[in-house]
Design a protein with these regions (language model features):
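Beta-rich carbohydrate-recognition modules and glycan-binding surfaces
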Residues: 1-232
Length: 232
């Protein structure tokens, strides 16, 4: 028994050493600058009778993206935003963001204290590819504490599915998986409390989805489970 315990102790030390020396697997997927197969568009409410005005341009000097918008002052709903389509032509091009733990924005914000981000994912239990609203929306209100260029990190865990989606799409609320393996679109839009008639702008230098794989940790835990089983 003592010999077995010594062997298990040595194996435990070896397991910890291997875990410590194993390289971490970093994951990074760029949203901007654009990758092949991605399509970026700016939108506003003019096609639906509104008078909001969105503008999108690029800056040659630093390869940044400049988006600006002014919401109309009428009584009807107003909106504007940016939309990245990751797979405009094929389900095969959805981004697999299972390893993503945060979205990182390098952006210069002017004229607003909040903007919304919305990640649309393909839910095999719900989504009809012909109905863009049937994709699962994961949203987050991003608070901007100051104007100017800044690095904003949004943990993916803070994105949530709004109640109105379950109601409008008649989806069972027990279906809670985010389905990050099928990231289809990313959207940035004006905040809920954006003032009408006031212009705001986002100068985007980069957007990336980042994460670290827990594969090595999983192997270590499995290794210790095997040792515990042998010891018992």
């Amino acid at each position: 028994m003592k010999r077995l315990n010594r062997i298990l102790f040595v194996l435990s030390v070896i397991g910890i050493a291997v875990y410590g020396l194993a390289p971490e697997r970093y994951f990074k997927d760029m949203v901007f600058p654009l990758q092949e197969s991605m399509i970026l568009t700016a939108y506003d409410d003019r096609d639906d009778g509104g008078m909001s005005r969105a503008n999108l341009s690029t800056t040659d000097a630093d390869s940044s993206l400049l988006f600006s918008c002014t919401l109309h002052t009428g009584e009807s709903p107003a909106w504007c935003g940016l939309l990245w389509s990751f797979a405009p032509d094929s389900l095969l091009h959805y981004r697999n963001w299972m390893l993503v733990d945060s979205l990182v924005f390098d952006v210069d914000v002017q004229g607003t204290t909040e903007f919304l981000i919305k990640l649309w994912t393909f839910d095999p239990d719900v989504t009809d590819p012909e109905n863009k609203f049937s994709f699962r929306p994961l949203i987050k209100e991003v608070t901007v504490e100051k104007e100017g260029r800044q690095r904003i990190v949004v943990p993916i865990s803070q994105l949530y599915v709004p109640d109105y989606w379950y109601e409008s799409q008649k989806v069972d609320r027990s279906l809670e998986l985010k389905h990050l393996e099928g990231a289809a679109r990313l959207e940035i839009s004006s905040g809920w409390n954006m003032k009408r008639g006031k212009s705001f702008s986002l100068k985007i230098y980069s957007i990336e989805a980042k994460g670290v794989s827990s594969f090595a940790l999983g192997l270590l835990l499995f290794f210790f489970l095997a040792i515990a089983t042998i010891a018992v």
